[in-house]
Amino acid sequence: MGFRNRILFRWLPWACLIVVIPSVLWRVAMLCGANTGFAETNLYRGSFSGTIYVLTLEVVQLAAASACVYLAYANTIRYGRLPLIIGGIGNLMLYYIVGCFVIILIRYSQGADVWTPMRAMDATQRLWLYIAYGPFLTWPLLLTGALFGYQERRKAEKHEIMTM
């Protein structure tokens, strides 16, 4: 693996963590009382179970993104393919989530009556929603690159051990 690729594959896992932070901040701002324009704000802010749901979502999302960073610095020989298997399953779930989101967005833009968080939002609130969730949509692509980089490093380390 060339020097450029090594640097790229080292930073992709960090990018996986960075792209989830804006959406986490948006949801926390919603819980703290910011006027995000989200139609179901009272459902989450007004009940204990709704608040717990959102906070649990934040913890799970940040934990999964932090696990992506592990791909950059893990002792690859010790765990073998396990990070690839777990990361691959997680990545498939991310592609599914993003795919569903894109389908809903396309249907909404064509005038279909589908649920969307943008129902009660003005233009500024929609802009903030796009800023918060736009980077999130790149997470599966970044994780794919991070998994590929992990596999390449794993192969290189294995080859290095075999040639010693």
What is the role of each PLM region?
Residues 21-55:
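Hydrophobic transmembrane helix segments
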Residues 14-20, 81-99, 164:
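Transmembrane alpha-helical segments of multi-pass membrane proteins
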Residues 2-16, 47-53, 76-86, 125-131:
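Membrane-interface helix-boundary signature
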Residues 2-5, 72-79, 141-164:
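Cytosolic juxtamembrane helix at the C-terminal end of the final transmembrane segment
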Residues 51-62, 123-144:
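Hydrophobic alpha-helical transmembrane segments
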Residues 22-34, 93-110:
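C-terminal TM-helix exit segments that contain a strictly Trp-centered aromatic cap at the helix terminus
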Residues 49-72, 92:
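Core segments of alpha-helical transmembrane spans in multipass integral membrane proteins
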Residues 37-48, 100-130:
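Interfacial non-cytosolic loop connecting adjacent transmembrane helices
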